[in-house]
Amino acid sequence: IRYPKKIPAGKRLKDLILNVDFAPTLAEFAGIRMEDVQGDSFVKNLEGKTPADWRKEIYYRYWTNHAIRPAHFAIRSDRYKLIFYYARNLDMTDTENFDFTPSWDFYDLQNDPHENHNAYNDPKYAPVIKQMKKDMLNLRKEVGDTDEKYPEMQELLEKYYYK
């Protein structure tokens, strides 16, 4: 984002920002107050005043199911990324059906910034993965992404998530 009155060209953030944060941010720049929106304005972050309570992890979901990139949801921190590939169409259109066993990916972004090595089964990361799974469940609940209307997802979560 570049805003000559406040944000110099080339400004980069390391803070974790979500796409839902852009609407409240742009609204704040325009002097419009938005209430009851999912995202958070990151104007303060852009001004170099990141709030102390700014998120340390983000949750996202990729609904579209294709063989090249199966449907999944994930949690990311500044250092780690944990992804659950469930590969189901659910109610989505423009998706593909293909055989795929649900699986996990885990990356240490500090040691593997290009995500070349899936470290999900590396025992040294077991405590981090366990905590991130808990955090992911909490973030899913926080944004209302609980899959309650998809019994198939509940079965997959029982089989692959909680083990």
Regions found by a protein language model. Give the residues of each.
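Substrate-binding rim/cap in mid-to-C-terminal beta-strand-loop elements of soluble/periplasmic
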Residues: 1-36, 40-52, 78
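Active-site rim elements
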Residues: 6-17, 29-35, 66-71, 94, ...
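A structural signal for well-ordered alpha-helical segments within the folded catalytic domains
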Residues: 17-24, 40, 77, 101-104, ...
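Long, internal low-complexity/basic segments
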Residues: 22, 101, 119-163
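WW-domain-binding short linear motifs
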Residues: 56-60, 154
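C-terminal, low-complexity/hydrophilic appendages and adjacent surface loops
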Residues: 62-121, 156-163
